[in-house]
Amino acid sequence: MVVPYGSSDPMHWWKAVHDGTEYGFGTMTNSLTLGCDCLGEIYYLDAHKLAFDGSVETIENAICIHEEDFGVQWKHNDSTQMGYNEVRRSRRLVVSSFATIGNYDYGIFWYLYLDGTIQLEIKLTGVVGISAFHEDIHKPGQDFKISPELASPIHQHLFNVRIDWDLDDGDNQLFETNVEP
């Protein structure tokens, strides 16, 4: 993951931070709190990481696994048969964690659906990076004026994820097709 900045501010113009590789999502993972970070019937996993001295450190409750309702998956109401109404609820398994890197908290959510679909959602939260606003330095289109005295730089969070699909054996392939009119 890389975070390039598009600001003219001397505090930010030089930045192109590699949050995921320079700091590491794994090493910056938070312990999750019951009832706040995950809801429902929850199973937590601890994570283990190497410390700078080579010892092993444990992050308790680093990964949350739970199941949640995801609406109607299938429904049929047959008007030719009185009272025939079938509904199947959709469920998804959620595997999630949070990592704090600098002023950002990244929530990483993997969703596993009953139809085999796998979805990744990354939620960004935290504290806005700011600098003192000055009309000669901060330009529209490069910085946001968030108050009369403060500016925040325009930047992006670009993620790239690789999944190793060696399920059952190494001969499996995955194809994605995008159809446009």
What are these regions (language model features)?
Residues M1-P181:
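Beta-strand/loop-rich accessory regions of lumenal/periplasmic or secreted enzymes
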